[in-house]
Amino acid sequence: MPTGSQPSSACSARVRSPTPSFLWWDVRLQPRLGTVEVRIMDGQTTVEDVAAIAALVQALASVELERCDDPGPEPRAPELIEENRFLAARDGMAALLIDARSGERVPAIEQLERILGACRRHARWLRCERELAIVRRLARQNGALRQLAHASGDGNLRCVSARLAGAYAPRTTPMHAATKIAC
């Protein structure tokens, strides 16, 4: 398993941001902090969901660190990455992504299952198996979908906000009392 040492040049080449100060990035190394920064998928609406995404990112980083010493194939064509990013942004988990190996369209959920399979051993090592398992649920029913379902009922966005506040704050806190709305 990865040791957490400084990334090799092969590993750094897999990260697409030229410098830590670069503004337009998906994943970038932050050597000053010893971290990897990732542009997050939709804002998560519960701490459990945040932990699931963090577990996925940790396990993926561990997978990639392990692969850094393997010369393997060159990074994929930027056009393929851009197309898949567009498809995912437009269609979410309903997207048909382009498989880098076969060039065929593959449901995003199948791609996710492959990724989770690759992450399983790393999640065990990182002790985040329980959190990683939540990613499957998020793929099918995430916070954005829950918010849309709440809003579609009566269209009251204040109720959506109240439900979000309730997901974060226990019902006995002053914050909850301040957001009490008849929904």
Where are these regions (language model features)?
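C-terminal accessory/tail domains of diverse enzymes
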Residues: 1-183
